[in-house]
Each structure stands twice: as structure tokens, then as C-alpha cells.
Curated annotation (Swiss-Prot):
Homology family: Belongs to the ABC transporter superfamily. Protein-1 exporter (TC 3.A.1.109) family.
GO molecular function: ABC-type transporter activity; ATP binding; ATP hydrolysis activity; ATPase-coupled lipid transmembrane transporter activity
Stretches that traverse the bilayer: 159-179, 192-212, 270-290, 296-316, 389-409
InterPro entries xrefs: AAA+_ATPase, ABC1_TM_dom, ABC1_TM_sf, ABC_transporter-like_ATP-bd, ABC_transporter-like_CS, ATPase_T1SS_HlyB, P-loop_NTPase, Peptidase_C39
Organism of provenance: Mannheimia haemolytica
EC number(s) recorded for this UniProt protein: 7.4.2.5
Protein name (Swiss-Prot/TrEMBL): Leukotoxin translocation ATP-binding protein LktB
UniProt keywords, alphabetically: ATP-binding, Cell inner membrane, Cell membrane, Membrane, Nucleotide-binding, Translocase, Transmembrane, Transmembrane helix, Transport
């Protein structure tokens, strides 16, 4: 009845779903009590206020249909008649719209005409604010401004050194002018010696200061690089599990590797070229003093460089985007192939995999070649402008010298000064590919750094967990347009109780434990531990007090001891050995040559499947968690290993709440209570013998299948 009542207020339903999309839990009844004061449903103003109270940033806008592909989705399409719906995706190629019908509780694909018929032009855009956990500010080029301010003293020193370098660059042409116009004409050898010594001193200072500037600048940018790299990794590990499940491993690795492009840009010559370019106005003033006509030629060339860059840049950026996509595909395929090498060899599909790799590699090389060709065309265009300006200046300068308006020394000095102006422009133009590449890299890296971290609405870090668990009216799906996984699940688990959960594949058993670990926030309802809502709890605090053993566990390339004591490297050896004995792992570990110091290899490749599983069980037990989850933990074990675990099960379960998920019913038959799930709902519960008495029940049916 409560769900039906909520379904009548589509605004509240939409708010619940959008909050869940951003990993924020809410109590619909509490929102209704606070903001639906007249009982007629949430108005536009109250909806925005309710979103703000949930740490969501909501904005009401009016947007034409033709521009909907530019907005951040999913968004709420607000209707004056109250029949709101969610806009999930816009397919501009086929003029189709993926929406979510809140009344029918199902996704819909609408054609252009169908969407125009129901769209009234009003949208509510929803994004998550920075959480209490701490979310990085939006990552783009502006991210580097605070970093530059932080090291402003060092950058100020670099600026001062640059000023002196420009002064030296200004003095050198004057020396040449004096030599050409004075020394050679008057045969002044003593003056020549003085100028030569002075020029040598200037050159030495210029070399030393230039090297010093490069060193100081590289040192500062390296610090920024370290900060960015550290924040990137911390942020990556703070992202919700859904981020990784929705992306290929290779894609994520490829985005993280974009940090190398930013690093090369920061430590390269591009930024020092920008500093040199800033001093060009001083050179222009001196050049104007020599010859306004020649200076106008130089000034006239600058728009040519800019226009050429404007012409090349969009094409180059598109090709760089394509190159990145091909590279990410290759990275993902390579990671997938290496990870699945046992399957590839077992099925003898290496030729097919090689053929796929060859095609993808050829596509990447072709894309990379197109980038190189376009970059070469861009650089040659810059060279053409430079050579053309040089020819014009030579012709015009010679005319000015012949007419007596300019001396030979002044012409030489002018050309040297113009070289100081044009050189950083040319370097920047030639490095334009790097500018474009680093822009792509910042965007790609922003996909990681701008993704919201796991959020919680309070600072709830409770004392040690006791073990009471409660699922209240849980409704959950992994995506707004995905099917419902859990539907109106209610379950109470008492402290110290051993619960078995069984059911067909896809019935929602593992999803229930993922909600308990707060990997996801339910769309509706609450998950409570000791009466406290997990939506308000710090995920790290929670997970440190829950032990989890999965069917496929990952071991790190470290020693057995380090893997068991992963959460506390300084843990006493006695605790490690005790946990290993409980898990039935101590005997086989003792037989190894290095014992607990044996390196297990990448993902535990040096051990058998049963040995890996027992070490994973020991790792889950070593912290003495009050809640223990076995998700098909014994299904990969041989019967002897499983027998050892089951013998110790009474000790393992003592003093803690245990949830056993299994397809093999023999694993759960001694549980205090067995929960039977089907299509996201609890259909039966009771002890083993009680469930068998219901011959028409699902548990009895599964039991009969296993007996046969």
C-alpha cells in the first residue's frame, strides 16, 4: 500500500531513483513529511528543496529538444500535469529517446514524434555535490591554478629568471649591431675585444640561468605531478563499485595512463615557451624603434599562425579522440587476453584472438598515422609562414638599407630580435599537438576524477558492531533502466544467527550481501545494522567489521602472511596462524618451503584453487569480524578441503552473525534458518527439515534435484 501511494507521486519516485543513481539513500516517507505539506505531491519548488537536502545539486531549466543531447543525463522531465518521467539517453543518430516511465515502472524507447508529444520543454538536471568524504573539485585545466598558487614562490623565482634571460636576449643583438656599425667601420680592435668578452659573459650567464630555470621549473612541476598522481589513485580507490562494473578494466587503465601525457606536458618546454612569449611586447617596442615597416610584417604574421592553428585544431582533436578510443580498445583487449590466458590455451583459440588483435592493432596504427600526418601538415604550414616572413623581411630590409633608412647592423639586430619573438610562437605552434593531446588527456582523466566517490549523508562511525541485521522494504535495481533485482524484501537477522540463503541463479542472493556491504544504496527501503541505517555510515568503517569470502577471491602478489594480514600488516603472527588453522590452511602452509613467507604469485597463481580459497577464508577471519559472509565460498573447494572447513564451522560461526550463500544445499542444512529466494523475493524460510516438509516448495524441489 505504501509503495502504491508513493507511486502516485511521480516526483517523489523520480527523486528516489535519481538519489539512488548518485549513491544517496533517502527515506521517501521522511521526504514526504518534510516537503509534501499539502499531501498533493511534491511541487517544483519543494522538489528542488528536497534534492538540496539530500546533498544533490538540482537545477530547473528549459531546453529545446534539439539541444537535449548536450545535457547531463539522467534528468527529470518535469510535466505540469504531474506525469513526470526520466530521460536516460538521447540517440541523435536514430532520433530515439530512452526514457523511464515512472507510472509503469519500466524503461521505454520513444521515437521523435512520440517524445515531442509528451515533452513540455522543462528539465531538472541533477548532479551530486561534494560529499563529506571529500570529492575533488571538477578536474580540468583550472585544477592546476591552486597548485600553481601553492608553489607561487618558486614560480615567481622562475619568472624573475625569465626576465633576466629576456634582458640578455635583448642585449645580444645590440652587441652585434655595435660590431657591424662601429667596430668594422672604425677598425676598433680594443672595442671588439671588450664586446667579445662582454658577449661571452652574457652567454655564460644565459646558459646558467636557462639551465637553472629548467631545473627549478621541472622540480616544481614534478611536485604537482606527484600530487595529481597521489590524488588520482586515492580517488580511484574511493569510487563506488558501480564505476568499475560499468567500465572495462582496460578503459580505466588507459585513462589513468593519460597522466603520462600531462606529466610530459608539464615538464616539457611548452610552459617555458609561454613565459618567453609573454615578454614579446618588450621586443616589439625595440623592433618598432628600429623599423616600423619590418615590425608590421612580423605582427602581420601572427594572425596567420593563429588562423592556421584554428583550422588544424578541430580536425586534430577529432583524430586524437579516435586514436585514444583505439588505444583504449587495445588496452582492454590485452588485459582481457592476459587475464583469460588459461581459457585461451585450453580452447586453442589463440589464432582467433591473434586475428582480432591484428585487426585492432592495424586500426590503431592507421589512426595514429592519420594524427602524425595531420600534425606534420600543421608543422610544415608553420614553417611555410616563417620562411615567407623571412623572405619578405630580407627583401624589405635590403631596400631600407640601400635607401639609407636602416644600417646593416640594425638590420642584423632586428632579425635577431624578431627571431626571439617568433621562436616561442613557432615552438608553441609545433607543440600544438601536445596542447591538443593534453586537452584530451585532461578530459579522459576527468572521467575518473570527476566521478563522485562513495558518499554518505552523515558521519556515522559506530563502535564495534554487534551483528543485528535488518532489511526493510528493500527494492533495488543496478541501473534506472535495468530490471528489478530485489523487490520488497524484508528480513530480520539476529545477532549470532547463522543464516543460509539459497535460490536459483539471478534470484538476488549476492545482491543482498552487496547492499549489506554498502556497495550500493537501495532504491527504496533501508538496510540496518544494530538499528543504524547504513546509508548514513562510513563505508570504510563498515567494511572493516565485515568479513567476506567470495567464490573467486583475489590474492595479491605478496607472501601468504601479508595476504592474510592485509588489513593490518603489523598483526601478530599468532593471530595469523590462528586464522589459518580455523580456515584449514595451516597444514598445507607449513609444508611449503618458505611457510608463511611464500610468495603466492599474481592473483595467487602459485597455489591451487582450494589453497587460495582457504587463505581467503583466513583473511576474512583474522580481524574477528562480527558479521561474516560466505558467498559460494566452498563451492570451489575439493571435498577434503570443504570437510576441513565444515569441521571448523562451529568455531568459525561462534560469536558472530554468519550469512551462507550456496547452491549446494548441504552447505546450509545446519544453518539456524534458511532463506529461499526467487526472482528477487523471499518465498520461503525456516530450518532444513521444516522446508522439506513443504513438498511443493522451491527448497524441496532444489533438494530433490541435488539428490537425483
Amino acid at each position: 500500500m505504501e509503495a502504491n501511494h508513493q507511486r502516485n507521486d511521480l516526483g517523489l519516485v523520480a527523486l528516489t531513483m535519481l538519489a539512488q543513481y548518485h549513491n544517496i539513500s533517502l527515506n521517501p516517507e521522511e521526504i514526504k513529511h518534510k516537503f509534501d505539506l499539502d499531501g498533493k505531491g511534491l511541487s517544483l519548488t519543494s522538489w528542488l528543496l528536497a534534492a538540496k537536502s539530500l546533498a544533490l545539486k538540482a537545477k530547473h531549466i528549459k531546453k529545446e529538444i534539439s539541444r537535449l543531447h548536450l545535457v547531463n543525463l539522467p534528468a527529470l522531465v518535469w510535466q505540469d500535469n504531474g506525469k513526470h518521467f526520466l530521460l536516460v539517453k538521447v540517440d541523435t543518430d536514430n532520433n530515439r529517446y530512452l526514457t523511464y516511465n515512472l507510472e509503469q515502472d519500466a524503461p521505454q524507447i520513444l521515437s521523435q514524434d512520440e517524445f515531442e508529444a509528451c515533452y513540455q520543454g522543462q528539465l531538472i538536471l541533477v548532479t551530486s555535490r561534494a560529499s563529506v568524504v571529500g570529492q575533488l573539485a571538477k578536474f580540468d585545466f583550472t585544477w592546476f591554478i591552486p597548485a600553481v598558487i601553492k608553489y607561487r614562490k618558486i614560480f615567481l623565482e622562475t619568472l624573475i629568471v625569465s626576465i633576466f634571460l629576456q634582458i640578455f636576449a635583448l642585449i645580444t643583438p645590440l652587441f652585434f649591431q655595435v660590431v657591424m656599425d662601429k667596430v668594422l667601420v672604425h677598425r676598433g680592435f680594443s672595442t671588439l675585444n671588450i664586446i667579445t668578452v662582454a658577449l661571452a659573459i652574457v652567454i655564460i650567464f644565459e646558459i646558467v640561468l636557462s639551465g637553472l630555470r629548467t631545473y627549478v621549473f621541472s622540480h616544481s612541476t614534478s611536485r604537482i605531478d606527484v600530487e595529481l598522481g597521489a590524488k588520482l589513485f586515492r580517488h580511484l580507490l574511493s569510487l563506488p563499485i558501480s564505476y568499475f562494473e560499468n567500465r572495462r578494466v582496460g578503459d580505466t587503465v588507459a585513462r589513468v595512463r593519460e597522466l603520462d601525457q600531462i606529466r610530459n606536458f608539464l615538464t616539457g618546454q611548452a610552459l617555458t615557451s609561454v613565459l618567453d612569449l609573454l615578454f614579446s611586447f618588450i621586443f616589439f617596442a625595440v623592433m618598432w624603434y628600429y623599423s616600423p615597416k619590418l615590425t608590421l610584417v612580423i605582427l602581420g604574421s601572427l594572425p596567420c599562425y593563429i588562423l592556421w592553428s584554428i583550422f588544424i585544431s578541430p580536425i586534430l582533436r577529432r583524430r586524437l579522440d579516435d586514436k585514444f578510443a583505439r588505444s583504449a580498445d587495445n588496452q582492454a583487449f590485452l588485459v582481457e587476453s592476459v587475464t583469460a590466458i588459461n581459457m585461451i590455451k585450453a580452447m586453442a583459440v589463440a589464432p582467433q584472438m591473434t586475428d582480432t588483435w591484428d585487426k585492432q592493432l592495424a586500426s590503431y596504427v592507421s589512426s595514429s598515422f592519420r594524427v602524425t600526418v595531420l600534425a606534420t601538415i600543421g608543422q610544415q604550414g608553420v614553417q611555410l609562414i616563417q620562411k615567407t616572413v623571412m623572405v619578405i623581411n630580407l627583401w624589405l630590409g635590403a631596400h631600407l638599407v640601400i635607401s639609407g633608412d636602416l644600417s646593416i647592423g640594425q638590420l642584423i639586430a632586428f632579425n635577431m630580435l624578431s627571431g626571439q619573438v617568433i621562436a616561442p610562437v613557432i615552438r608553441l605552434a609545433q607543440l600544438w599537438q601536445d596542447f591538443q593531446q593534453v586537452g584530451i588527456s585532461v578530459t579522459r582523466l576527468g572521467d575518473v576524477l570527476n566521478s563522485p566517490t562513495e558518499q554518505y549523508q552523515g558521519k556515522l562511525s559506530l563502535p564495534e558492531i554487534k551483528g543485528d541485521i535488518s532489511f526493510k522494504n528493500i527494492r533495488f535495481r543496478y541501473k534506472p533502466d535495468a530490471p528489478t533485482i530485489l523487490n520488497n524484501v524484508n528480513l530480520e537477522i539476529r545477532q549470532g544467527e547463522v543464516i543460509g540463503i539459497v535460490g536459483r541463479s539471478g534470484s538476488g542472493k549476492s545482491t543482498l550481501t552487496k547492499l549489506l556491504q554498502r556497495f550500493y544504496i537501495p532504491e527504496n527501503g533501508q538496510v540496518l545494522i544494530d538499528g543504524h541505517d547504513l546509508a548514513l555510515a562510513d563505508p570504510n568503517w563498515l567494511r572493516r567489521q565485515i568479513g567476506v569470502v567470495l567464490q573467486d577471491n583475489v590474492l595479491l602478489n605478496r607472501s601468504i602472511r601479508e595476504n592474510i594480514a592485509l588489513s593490518d600488516p603489523g598483526m601478530p603472527m599468532e593471530r595469523v596462524i590462528y586464522a589459518a588453522k580455523l580456515a584449514g590452511a595451516h597444514d598445507f602452509i607449513s609444508e611449503l618451503r618458505e611457510g608463511y613467507n611464500t610468495i603466492v604469485g599474481e592473483q595467487g597463481a602459485g597455489l591451487s584453487g582450494g589453497q587460495r580459497q582457504r587463505i581467503a577464508i583466513a583473511r576474512a577471519l583474522v580481524n574477528n569480524p562480527k558479521i561474516l559472509i560466505f558467498d559460494e565460498a566452498t563451492s570451489a573447494l575439493d571435498y577434503e578441503s570443504e570437510h576441513i572447513i565444515m569441521q571448523n564451522m562451529q568455531k568459525i560461526c561462534q560469536g558472530r552473525t554468519v550469512i551462507l550463500i550456496a547452491h549446494r544445499l548441504s552447505t546450509v542444512k545446519n544453518a539456524d534458518r534458511i532463506i529461499v529466494m526467487e526472482k528477487g523475493e523471499i518465498v520461503e524460510q525456516g530450518k532444513h527439515h521444516e522446508l522439506l516438509q513443504n513438498s511443493n516448495g522451491l527448497y524441496s524441489y532444489l533438494h530433490q534435484l541435488q539428490l537425483n
